[in-house]
From Swiss-Prot:
Intracellular or extracellular location(s): Cytoplasm
Organism of this sequence: Metallosphaera sedula (strain ATCC 51363 / DSM 5348 / JCM 9185 / NBRC 15509 / TH2)
Pfam families associated with the record: eIF-5a, IF5A-like_N
A Gene Ontology cellular-component term: cytoplasm
Protein name: Translation initiation factor 5A
């Protein structure tokens, strides 16, 4: 998986950004023009996709930031062992283990043979929803 580049000024709520090496979803963007000769600054508040931790970024509007490439795929649950879920990709038929999602509404629906949507972001995988 990879990373694209964008400017801070193009970020808006709901977009994705990499802050401190962690892929995050932007929840709030505020822009402020500083004094007479200063460039505009943006304050971005984002939540980590994997940990749920809140992260902030303060940078000039014209500076470059990393945007993660999110690959959305479908898989089928093969087994559910404690805090790990074994999934088979429905296109490539490869099998792998993913950590059990922390969201209770998603975790409660995971059972054998259920179809799930998972995201692969920067080499890490996460179950997002159950069909």
């Amino acid at each position: 998986m990879g990373i694209n580049y964008s400017t801070v000024g193009e970020m808006k709520e709901g977009s994705y950004i990499v802050i401190d090496g962690e892929p995050c979803r932007v929840v709030e963007v505020t822009k402020a023009k500083t004094g007479k000769h200063g460039s505009a600054k943006a304050n971005i508040i984002a939540v980590s996709i994997f940990t749920g931790a809140k992260k902030t970024l303060m940078a000039p509007v014209d500076s470059t930031v990393e945007v993660p490439i999110i690959e959305k795929r479908m898989g089928q649950v093969i087994s559910n062992v404690g805090d790990k879920v074994q999934i088979m990709d429905l296109e490539t038929y490869e099998t792998f283990e993913i950590d059990m999602p922390t969201e209770e509404d998603v975790a409660s629906k995971i059972k054998k043979d259920a179809e799930v949507e998972y995201w692969e972001v920067m080499g890490r995988k996460k179950i997002v929803r159950v069909k």
